[in-house]
Amino acid sequence: MASSETLTITDYITHHLQNMTYGKLPAGYARHHADGEVHVLEHDTWTMAHTAEEAAAMGFNAVHVDTLGWGIFLALVVGFFMRRVAVKATTDTPRGMASFIEFLVEGINGVVKDVFHHKNRLVAPMAITVFSWVFMMNLMDLIPVDWLPMAAQIVSGNEHLFFKVVPTTDPNATLGMAVTVFILMLFFSVQQKGLWGFIKELTCHPFFAPRKFWYFNLILIPFNFILETVALIAKPISLGLRLFGNLYAGEMIFILIATLFSVGLLFGFLGGILQFGWAVLHILVILIQAFVFMVLTTVYMAMAHDRHDEH
């Protein structure tokens, strides 16, 4: 695609940053076709977006098909290999994939034991699942940026098809995972502390006056509630945006390097060297971001189980 004569470098970059979007265009929306024809919709219409402007016009009533599809596919891949190893597990020394899975499970279990000091059988499997899934989604960033989009265009017969293959470069995916972690955090908080204990945690920390100065709490409780609520909401936002920002930046660098192939043979050769060098460095980003997301998820689960001293 980088060498296409119909695309400028700006068009190329914009095209690679746009998701395949299915959604509802409002009645009265004017669709501009490639042949110059303009079609005004008479009714609200569910359709695939042909341009970035159409995707934006769909607003909240839209689904990023590529993000959803690749996310589900990679989750199934992780589940398949985990189940295959579990079914074939024996008391003998593990080899091949089984050895790698054992190394992964033992390593993450060690991290969970260091961070999570409570009893909950769900947390370690959750951490393993989160790390494996996020790592696989991040790993898609190492596939050359044009390969899968071009294959999708050939199969579909649509040379303008949008097709992003790295789910974690879509903030909808990363924030969606972060919100799920946030909901689990709230669930375990209420489960472990009770609804009243959870409310007290929001209103009686970090500042609380002794009983003989109870009247100061009339001021401190609203202040505490604002501070704790902001801190609580910031957790999923920072968790999701951290993963998105790092992977999006890495993907953008790959795309910018790929534009060198359209300039000429010399720049194409330079681009190949840069692609390889950045891919090697980006492996660390892929691993670290999956690890950080997993560790923070475990930390948030530990915070949900922690009990503050009663006043």
Curated annotation (Swiss-Prot):
<dbReference type="GO" id="GO:0046933">
    <property type="term" value="F:proton-transporting ATP synthase activity, rotational mechanism"/>
</dbReference>
<comment type="similarity">
    <text>Belongs to the ATPase A chain family.</text>
</comment>
<dbReference type="GO" id="GO:0005886">
    <property type="term" value="C:plasma membrane"/>
</dbReference>
<keyword id="KW-0066">ATP synthesis</keyword>
<keyword id="KW-0472">Membrane</keyword>
<dbReference type="Pfam" id="PF00119">
    <property type="entry name" value="ATP-synt_A"/>
</dbReference>
<feature type="transmembrane region" description="Helical">
    <location>
        <begin position="276"/>
        <end position="296"/>
    </location>
</feature>
<dbReference type="InterPro" id="IPR035908">
    <property type="entry name" value="F0_ATP_A_sf"/>
</dbReference>
<keyword id="KW-0812">Transmembrane</keyword>
<dbReference type="GO" id="GO:0042777">
    <property type="term" value="P:proton motive force-driven plasma membrane ATP synthesis"/>
</dbReference>
<dbReference type="InterPro" id="IPR000568">
    <property type="entry name" value="ATP_synth_F0_asu"/>
</dbReference>
<keyword id="KW-1133">Transmembrane helix</keyword>
<keyword id="KW-0997">Cell inner membrane</keyword>
<protein>
    <recommendedName>
        <fullName>ATP synthase subunit a</fullName>
    </recommendedName>
</protein>
<feature type="transmembrane region" description="Helical">
    <location>
        <begin position="253"/>
        <end position="273"/>
    </location>
</feature>
<feature type="transmembrane region" description="Helical">
    <location>
        <begin position="123"/>
        <end position="143"/>
    </location>
</feature>
<dbReference type="GO" id="GO:0045259">
    <property type="term" value="C:proton-transporting ATP synthase complex"/>
</dbReference>
<feature type="transmembrane region" description="Helical">
    <location>
        <begin position="213"/>
        <end position="233"/>
    </location>
</feature>
<comment type="subunit">
    <text>F-type ATPases have 2 components, CF(1) - the catalytic core - and CF(0) - the membrane proton channel. CF(1) has five subunits: alpha(3), beta(3), gamma(1), delta(1), epsilon(1). CF(0) has three main subunits: a(1), b(2) and c(9-12). The alpha and beta chains form an alternating ring which encloses part of the gamma chain. CF(1) is attached to CF(0) by a central stalk formed by the gamma and epsilon chains, while a peripheral stalk is formed by the delta and b chains.</text>
</comment>
<keyword id="KW-0813">Transport</keyword>
<comment type="function">
    <text>Key component of the proton channel; it plays a direct role in the translocation of protons across the membrane.</text>
</comment>
<feature type="transmembrane region" description="Helical">
    <location>
        <begin position="62"/>
        <end position="82"/>
    </location>
</feature>
<keyword id="KW-0138">CF(0)</keyword>
<keyword id="KW-1003">Cell membrane</keyword>
<feature type="transmembrane region" description="Helical">
    <location>
        <begin position="179"/>
        <end position="199"/>
    </location>
</feature>
<dbReference type="InterPro" id="IPR023011">
    <property type="entry name" value="ATP_synth_F0_asu_AS"/>
</dbReference>
<dbReference type="InterPro" id="IPR045082">
    <property type="entry name" value="ATP_syn_F0_a_bact/chloroplast"/>
</dbReference>
<keyword id="KW-0375">Hydrogen ion transport</keyword>
<keyword id="KW-0406">Ion transport</keyword>
